[in-house]
From Swiss-Prot:
One cellular component term from this protein's GO annotations in UniProt: plasma membrane
Keyword Cell membrane: yes
Domain of life: Bacteria
Pfam families hit by this protein: DUF1328
Transmembrane segments annotated in the record for this chain: 4-24, 27-47
Family statement drawn from the similarity comment of this UniProt entry: Belongs to the UPF0391 family.
Subcellular localization: Cell membrane
Protein's name in the database: UPF0391 membrane protein KPN_04833
Organism, scientific name: Klebsiella pneumoniae subsp. pneumoniae (strain ATCC 700721 / MGH 78578)
Keywords in alphabetical order: Cell membrane, Membrane, Transmembrane, Transmembrane helix
Membrane topology annotation: Multi-pass membrane protein
Length: 53
């Protein structure tokens, strides 16, 4: 999940340097979505992680 987030982040940073538009804007939107989903999954796993039986 974080690998995809990093890939989309790099694409989004390149898109930001060149101006958001078309496919670049879509990649930036996808990077935001993947980042938020990754953070939510991290927080869920943090609170429901390994507990002693």
């Amino acid at each position: 999940m974080f690998r995809w987030g990093i890939i989309f982040l790099v694409i989004a940073l390149i898109a930001a340097a060149l101006g958001f538009g078309g496919l670049a804007g879509t990649a930036a939107g996808a990077a935001k979505i993947v980042f938020v989903v990754g953070i939510i999954l991290f927080l869920v796993s943090l609170f429901t992680g390994r507990r002693r039986p």
